[in-house]
Amino acid sequence: MIQVSKVIPQGAGLAPVLVKRASTVELDWDVRQKSRFDATDSLGRTLGVFLPRGTLVRGGDVLVAEDGSMIKVIASPQPVLRITACSAHGSPFDLTRAAYHLGNRHVPIELKPDHLKIEPDHVLADMLRAMHLIVHEVEEAFEPEGGAYSAGGHGHGHDHGSHEHSAHDHGKHDHAPAKPATAATPAAHVHGPDCNHGHDHAHEAKPATIQIHKRRPDNL
């Protein structure tokens, strides 16, 4: 058994002539979603595949064996349900609605511009037909979406690992210290002719003028 522990997504970076000379191995989706499996390539060699946990193998990927040989993966045809919109009783939007309901059920879906593909399920097939969609069982390769956060998954045939994103380091730039807050000076309160609230603040009172009158005696 030849051990395989490396996968090159879509053979990125390899010379086309090397990929063309590589042996092939046909795998259905049930096997390709596993990180550990045995398979037999086109040369009759038994492969023991041990990939990082969570890795999804796609058709077009290239496996690298411990002896340096390469094996191109072919997604083998398998029974799937092909779902299309019914132009007579529905609209293309029905596919979007179907993808939403299938996603809520965590059903693996292959998304195409004009159709969807899922693994056979008679209950889901009846539900989709009730939504005015056309459902046919066919034999085709199945490449469902891997999920935005799946480890090692590359559902669109390119290697996201080659992109470099520089992280924004908040620890390396200095922020000027904030200026101390200055207490706002209250504005003078002005009462206009339309002011309707009462004057509850004190006004300075002027001192009262006291007048003293002397009383004349009655016998005068």
From Swiss-Prot:
Composition-biased stretches (Basic and acidic residues): 156-177, 191-206
Gene Ontology CC terms: cytoplasm
Any GO MF annotation of the entry: unfolded protein binding
Name of this protein: Urease accessory protein UreE
Keywords of the record: Chaperone, Cytoplasm, Nickel, Nickel insertion
One biological process term in Gene Ontology: protein folding
SUPFAM superfamilies given in the database record: Urease metallochaperone UreE, C-terminal domain, Urease metallochaperone UreE, N-terminal domain
Similarity field: Belongs to the UreE family.
Domain of life: Bacteria
Keyword Chaperone carried by entry: yes
Biased segments, Low complexity type: 178-188
Role, per record: Involved in urease metallocenter assembly. Binds nickel. Probably functions as a nickel donor during metallocenter assembly.
Stretches the record annotates as Disordered: 145-220
